[in-house]
Amino acid sequence: MDKVLNREESMELMDLLGLERAAWGNLPLMRKAYLRKCKEFHPDKGGDEDKMKRMNTLYKKMEQDVKVAHQPDFGAWHSSEVPTYGTEEWEAWWSSFNEKWDEDLFCHEDMFQSDEEGTADSQHSTPPKKKRKVEDPKDFPPDLHAFLSQAVFSNRTLACFAVYTTKEKGQILYKKLMEKYSVTFISRHSSHGHNILFFLTPHRHRVSAINNFCQKLCTFSFLICKGVNKEYLLYSTLSRDPYSIVEESIQGGLKEHDFNPEEPEETKQVSWKLITEYALETKCEDVFLLLGMYLEFQHNPEECRKCQKKEQPYHFKFHEKHFANATIFADSKNQKSICQQAVDTVLAKKRVDTLHMTREEMLTERFNHILDKMDIMFGATGSAVLEHYMAGVAWLHCLLPKMDTLIYDFLNCIVFNIPKRRYWLFKGPIDSGKTTLAAGLLDLCGGKALNVNLPMERLTFELGVAIDQFMVVFEDVKGSGAESKDLPSGHGINNLDSLRDYLDGSVKVNLEKKHLNKRTQIFPPGLVTMNEYPLPKTLQARFVKQIDFKPKIYLRKALNNSEFLLEKRILQSGMTLLLLLIWFRPVADFASDIQHRIVQWKERLDSEISMYTFSRMKYNICMGKCILDWAREEESETEDSGHGSSTESQSQCFSQASDTSGSADAPASQTPDPYDHDNPYHICKGFVCFKRPKTPPPK
C-alpha cells in the first residue's frame, strides 16, 4: 500500500474520506467511507465540486495501483528461484527484478539549456503542431433543418426518417435498417465526409425506437436520428450539391408524384355553430330534447310528415336548413357534447339578457315569442281552434272580477320589481282556480315553479332552479295549524319565513346548482299559492297583494262539460291570458314595439269572434253548460222563431225542401251537425272553411 500513493496523496485521501490515517490499507472501510463522501460532496446534493473531483482522482488512482500490486507476478519470488550469484543467470534475474522499480527511480541527468545558452535556431524555430482531432457534428447541416422535425421528447409516430452518422457506419446501417424495418425506400447520401440515410417505412414508428436500434451499432461513432416532415423536399435537397447520392434501393430514386397521391374527399365535419344557432332560435335549454329534435332533421324533408302537416314550428321551419348538417351529426360520436355546448350558449345568452336588458324589454320579447307561436298555431296550416282559446278566455274572465285589470296589475308588479312589493299570494280552498291562474301567469311571463315543502337541507338546490329566471311560483305551500283537518301539514310556510331575503329582493342572494359555481343575484319576483293555512306576520308583510279564491260550482260544471279546455291545457296556457289582454285591454297598454301586432290580432278577433258570440260563451259558463253550445242553441232557436235573416231562411227552406217527409219539425236524428261545413252555422276547425255565420240580431 505504501507504493500505491505517495505520502502526501495518501494523507490527503484519508482526510477527504474522513478516516484516521491508521486505517490506511483497510480497503472495505475506505470503500464505505468513499461512497458516503460521494453523497456528501456531490454537487447535486449541495456539496463541494472540487473536493469531489480530487477525491475521485485519488481514489481511482489508489484502486488502479492496488490492482497492479495484487497481480501474481508483482514482486513475487522464491529462494529456490534465485540463481547463483555472479553467473549470467543471476544478472538476468536481477535485471528483471528491478524492472518495476526503474520507472520510479529513473531521472534525467541531462541539464536543460537556459535561454542564454540556446542557439539562434532554437530560439526562432516553431515546434511542430499537433494534429487536432476533428469534432463530431452535433446536428444535421443547417440547410436541412427546415425539412426535419425538431421535437426531442415526443410520442409522435412517423413513417420517414433521416440518420446522420459516419461513412463507415452509414454502410452498415444501410443494410441493417433495410432488413429490420423492411423499408419501402432507403438511400445513402454523402455529406462533408459523413453519410446521411434517408428511408421510408411501411409502418409508423417513434423516432426514439429508430434511434435506439441504431445506437446499438454505433458505440463510438456519432449518431443523429430525426423524423422528416417534408419528405420529397429533403430527398431532392440531398440529391443536389453539396450532397450526392451514394446508393439507393430503387433505381432512379423517388419522384415528386410519389408523395402527392390523389386527394381524397374532404371529411365533412359537424357544424357546431349551426346547432348552436338552432338552440338559440328555439331557446332550448334541455340537452336531450335538443339532441332528439336535431336527430329528426336527418330524414329527407321532402318525405317528412311533420313538415307536410306543419304542426310543429320548431321542426318544419328549420328542417331543410339543417338537413345536411344533421346527416353528419347522426354519425358523430360526440353528439351529447355538441348539444351540451349549444345549451350552455342558450343559458349564457339568457344571462347576458338578464344583465343588460330591462325587465320591460324581457317581457316584450316574451310576448313576441308567444305572438309568433299564435301566428303559427292559428294560421292557415295550424291545427289550433281560436274558438277553443276564446272559450278559455271567457272561463278565466268569470273566475275573478276584473280579471284583465288583475293580470295587468300583476305584470306591472313583476316588471317594476320593487323591493318588498314583489310577491302576490293566491289563497283559497281546493279546486278554486289558484294553480290554474298561477300556471297561466307563469307561462305568460316565463319562469319556473318551485317546491318549498322540502326539508331545509334539500331546499338549496331547489332554489338554484331560479337562476336567471324572470319570475317564480312557489306552488301549493303547506303549513300547519289549519282550521280544516283535511289539510296536511308541511314545512313550506316555515321555509318561506326563513327566505325573507329572497322574497324582499333588497339584497343579492347566493343560488347554486349541482356541478356549477354559486350565482349571486337578486331572487326573481313571483307569487305563492296555498290553501287556507295561517300565516305569520313576518311572512304576511312580504306580500303586496293577497287574492282569496272561492270555488264556484258553475265554473266546475262548465269545465267538466268542455273537456277540450282540460285536454289541451288551454286554461294554463300563456296564450289564453294574452288573448284575454288583447280582448279587454286597449292597445296603449301594450309596449310600443308590439302594438302593431296587437292591432292585427284585435282586428282578427273582431272579425271572427263577435261580442254576441263571446257573451253566449259566458252565458253557457254561468249555466254550467259546454262553452261552445252557443252555435247549437242558435240553430234551434232560429228554427222555432223564424226570425232569421234571408240567408238563414234560404238555408232553412233548402233543408226543408230536401226533407222527404216535408214536415216543418225535423226529427232529432236529422238535427244539423254544428261541425258540418255545409251548415252556415257550423263551428269551423281551423281555416279549412272561410264561411263565417252572420251574427244574429240581438234578442
From Swiss-Prot:
Gene Ontology biological process: DNA replication; symbiont-mediated perturbation of host cell cycle G1/S transition checkpoint; symbiont-mediated suppression of host innate immune response; symbiont-mediated suppression of host JAK-STAT cascade via inhibition of JAK1 activity; symbiont-mediated suppression of host type I interferon-mediated signaling pathway
Modified sites of kind Phosphoserine: 114, 122, 125, 661
Domain of life assignment: Viruses
Region entry Disordered, spans: 115-137, 637-678
Top EC category: isomerase
Zinc finger (T-ag D1-type): 267-359
A GO molecular-function annotation: DNA replication origin binding
Cofactors (names): Mg(2+)
Catalysed reactions listed for this entry: Couples ATP hydrolysis with the unwinding of duplex DNA by translocating in the 3'-5' direction; ATP + H2O = ADP + phosphate + H(+)
Subcellular location: Host nucleus
Entry keyword Chaperone: no
Domain J: residue ranges: 12-75
SUPFAM superfamilies: Chaperone J-domain (SSF46565), Origin of replication-binding domain, RBD-like (SSF55464), P-loop containing nucleoside triphosphate hydrolases (SSF52540)
Domain SF3 helicase: 402-562
Keywords: Acetylation, Activator, ATP-binding, DNA replication, DNA-binding, Early protein, G1/S host cell cycle checkpoint dysregulation by virus, Glycoprotein, Helicase, Host nucleus, Host-virus interaction, Hydrolase, Inhibition of host innate immune response by virus, Inhibition of host interferon signaling pathway by virus, Inhibition of host JAK1 by virus, Interferon antiviral system evasion, Isomerase, Magnesium, Metal-binding, Modulation of host cell cycle by virus, Nucleotide-binding, Oncogene, Phosphoprotein, Transcription, Transcription regulation, Viral immunoevasion, Zinc, Zinc-finger
UniProt: ATP binding residues: 428-435
Domain remarks in the Swiss-Prot or TrEMBL record: The J domain is essential for multiple viral activities, including virion assembly, viral DNA replication, transformation and transcriptional activation.
Complexes and interactors: Forms homohexamers in the presence of ATP. Interacts with host HDAC1. Interacts (via LXCXE domain) with host RB1; the interaction induces the aberrant dissociation of RB1-E2F1 complex thereby disrupting RB1's activity. Interacts (via LXCXE domain) with host pRB-related proteins RBL1 and RBL2. Interacts (via C-terminus) with host TOP1 and POLA1 allowing DNA replication. Interacts with host TP53, inhibiting TP53 binding to DNA. Interacts with host preinitiation complex components TBP, TFIIA and TFIID to regulate transcription initiation.
Protein known as: Large T antigen
Lineage: Viruses, Monodnaviria, Shotokuvirae, Cossaviricota, Papovaviricetes
